[in-house]
């Protein structure tokens, strides 16, 4: 059980790393620049979407 949990944690961490490095496959809606914090620092909200977070 511990091995399964460790593998699961590693998969989650790698998926989060890939998400932040390459953006998301779907547009991230936002109202202000603060809504785009999950995409990284300095990402701006334009036309209701986080620009650099969307592929």
UniProtKB/Swiss-Prot annotation:
Known tissue expression: Expressed by the venom gland.
Cellular component, GO, one term: extracellular region
Presence of the UniProt keyword Disulfide bond in the record: yes
Membrane-spanning parts: none
InterPro entries: Scorpion_toxin-like_sf
Record keyword Transcription regulation present: no
Paired cysteines (S-S): 30-45, 36-50, 39-53
Signal peptide from the UniProt entry: 1-23
Subcellular location: Secreted
Note in the entry: Negative results: does not show any effect on Na(+), Ca(2+) currents, nor on voltage-gated and calcium-activated potassium channels.
Protein's recorded name: Neurotoxin X-29S
Lineage summary: Eukaryota, Metazoa, Ecdysozoa, Arthropoda, Chelicerata
């Amino acid at each position: 059980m511990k091995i399964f949990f460790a593998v699961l944690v590693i998969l989650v961490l790698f998926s989060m790393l890939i998400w932040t490095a390459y953006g998301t496959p779907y547009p991230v809606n936002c109202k202000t620049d603060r809504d785009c914090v999950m995409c990284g620092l300095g990402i701006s909200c334009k036309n209701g979407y986080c620009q650099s977070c969307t592929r």
